[in-house]
């Protein structure tokens, strides 16, 4: 006589006990092979990091300016390199990418150098001589991407002087009076980064001017600097505070007129904020003229 089929209630505990046994066995195996599990986890983490680094091209060696992603320049990425030589056109630097174990050892690197120029600095002849003496062939240095024009990269050059102390060669040249500040090519002139960079460069230049270092020993150079600074200030102030002509809006409503005035007022306040440093420069220039007359 056939047995009656087992009830569903009796099958459920058997299934639960079976699943529990599987979990127990897996846990026991993991405990017995804990080091292996840790090594697998570490290997997966390292593999993930390596894939991430390769995805953002940090391990790629750049031999021309066109190799460098636009995003690198926009984010002002710092790259490491080895100086090859200094020419009239700029510095030729061999890029040194991040190396990965077991990959970089057998990977054949392309050959080539990047043409790097000092961003925001116009070197004098004395400045070129000083730079030749300061930097040696094959010297390691960092260059921070700020702009690009054709095949040239405009960068901050950073040289390590021991420990965590890096010297910004762009500012150091200006502090010694071995160059003049110029606009950084390839950089968005309306960005906050532009004003921050030029503020630091102008501060370095003013240090040399106050001490009479380098080219600022000559009174003619000082006068030329003051004249250009004054003209530049007047041009920028007039441009940023240029209000809409009243005759063009005579037919508009009163509300739209007040709105336009309010917008212009806000724009003027922003201009004052952005050019606060130039106000300090004007004050400094006025004091120098006063001392000269005295």
From Swiss-Prot:
Q: Which GO cellular component terms, listed alphabetically, does the Swiss-Prot or TrEMBL entry include? A: extracellular space; membrane
The yes or no answer to whether the keyword Hydrolase is present is: no
What ranges does the record give for the region Disordered, renumbered to this chain?
A: 244-271
Membrane-topology annotation of the record: Single-pass membrane protein
> Which terms under GO biological process does the entry name?
negative regulation of ERK1 and ERK2 cascade; regulation of DNA-binding transcription factor activity
N-acetylalanine: residues bearing it: 2
Q: Which UniProt keywords apply?
A: Acetylation, Membrane, Transmembrane, Transmembrane helix
The protein's matches in InterPro entries, at most eight in alphabetical order, are given as: C3orf33-like (IPR042421), SNase_OB-fold_sf (IPR035437)
Q: List localization entries.
A: Membrane
Spell out where the chain crosses the membrane. Answer: 36-53
This protein's name: Protein C3orf33 homolog
Name the source organism. Answer: Mus musculus (Mouse)
């Amino acid at each position: 006589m056939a047995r009656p089929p087992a009830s569903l209630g009796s099958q459920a505990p058997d299934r639960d006990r079976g699943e529990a046994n599987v979990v127990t066995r897996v846990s026991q195996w993991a405990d017995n092979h804990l080091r292996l599990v840790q090594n697998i986890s570490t290997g997966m983490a390292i593999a993930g990091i390596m894939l991430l680094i390769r995805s953002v091209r940090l391990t790629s060696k750049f031999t021309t300016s066109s190799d460098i992603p636009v995003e690198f320049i926009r984010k002002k990425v710092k790259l490491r390199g080895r100086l090859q030589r200094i020419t009239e056109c700029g510095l030729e630097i061999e890029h040194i990418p991040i190396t990965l174990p077991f990959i970089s050892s057998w990977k054949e690197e392309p050959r080539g150098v990047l043409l790097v120029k000092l961003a925001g600095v116009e070197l004098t002849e004395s400045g070129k001589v000083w730079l030749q003496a300061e930097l040696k062939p094959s010297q390691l240095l960092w260059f921070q991407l700020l702009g690009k024009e054709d095949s040239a990269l405009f960068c901050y050059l950073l040289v390590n002087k021991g420990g965590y102390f890096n010297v910004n060669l762009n500012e150091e040249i200006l502090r010694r009076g071995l160059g003049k500040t110029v606009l950084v090519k390839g950089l968005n002139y309306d960005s906050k980064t532009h004003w921050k960079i030029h503020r630091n460069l102008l501060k370095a230049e003013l240090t040399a001017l106050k001490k009479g270092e380098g080219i600022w020993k000559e009174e003619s150079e000082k006068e030329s600097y003051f004249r250009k600074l004054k003209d530049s200030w007047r041009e920028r102030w007039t441009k940023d505070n240029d209000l809409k002509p009243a005759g063009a809006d005579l037919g508009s409503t009163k509300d739209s007129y007040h709105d336009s005035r309010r917008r212009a007022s806000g724009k003027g306040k922003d201009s004052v904020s952005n050019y606060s440093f130039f106000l300090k420069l004007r004050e400094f220039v006025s004091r120098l003229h006063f001392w000269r007359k005295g």
